């Protein structure tokens, strides 16, 4: 998964946001707020010291490759799910009347998406808007939304399409329509479309979402672990 995310982010934002990335002989880091994403490996004590220097409170890594920073504790296990290129998943059931009331927008305005994702957090909304514009203009991001009238009620995106992978994230449904299946169907539709184009859709999910993605039919590909600072 990080094979798509880190190289693409560095390629696009490395010059304008140099403090966001660190690349060493055996380790690449991307800083996102107080969270670091780590690919590769490093000395655990040196990694702990560097993350503390950067003000990080957590790091996400592949424990099979990268030993955790010294003194940090395991916070949660994150599961990688995916759909192999060319594979097709069946669409989850949704009530016909509800689904027919929705319109798919395969190119929603970036600010509309950002506002739907972060309605009460202007800083994160603006960051999401800027990043989506930068990636989509280069053909490196795909975002879909469902509209009900004038309202955006569901969205999901592939926010890093690179190196044969499509990193899917930010699946969100408006609260009144949650639990009705529209989010699951939109996720499967996008994953099927990406897989049909030869991409490998992948995404990372928290423990409480494992059952949801398993039920949709996605295959477990691996795990990352989030470690928290002492």
How would you describe each model-predicted region?
Residues 1-67, 123:
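N-terminal charged segments
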Residues 39-98, 102, 205, 225-229:
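Acyl-donor-binding surface of acyltransferase catalytic domains
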Residues 43-50, 169, 173-175, 179-196, ...:
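Conserved acetyl-CoA-binding loop-helix of GNAT-fold acetyltransferases
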């Amino acid at each position: 998964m990080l094979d798509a995310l880190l190289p693409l982010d560095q390629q696009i934002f490395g010059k304008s946001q140099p403090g966001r990335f660190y690349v060493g002989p055996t380790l690449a880091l991307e800083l996102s707020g107080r969270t670091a994403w780590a690919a590769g490996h490093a000395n655990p004590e040196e990694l702990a010291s560097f993350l503390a220097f950067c003000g990080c409170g957590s790091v996400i890594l592949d424990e099979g490759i990268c030993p955790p920073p010294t003194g940090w504790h395991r916070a949660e296990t994150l599961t990688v799910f995916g759909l192999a290129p060319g594979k097709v998943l069946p669409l989850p059931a949704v009530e016909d009347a509800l689904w027919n009331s929705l319109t798919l927008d395969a190119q929603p305005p970036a600010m509309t998406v950002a506002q739907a994702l972060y309605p009460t957090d202007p800083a994160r909304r603006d960051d999401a808007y800027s990043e989506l514009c930068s990636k989509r203009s280069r053909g490196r991001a795909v975002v879909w939304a469902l509209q009900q009238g004038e309202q955006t009620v569901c969205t999901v995106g592939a926010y890093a399409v690179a190196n044969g992978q499509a990193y899917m994230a930010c699946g969100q449904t408006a609260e009144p329509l949650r639990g009705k299946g529209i989010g699951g169907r939109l996720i499967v539709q996008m994953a099927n479309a990406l897989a049909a184009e030869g991409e490998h859709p992948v995404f990372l999910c928290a423990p409480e979402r494992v059952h949801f993605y398993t039920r949709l039919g996605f295959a477990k590909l691996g795990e990352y672990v989030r470690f928290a600072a002492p």
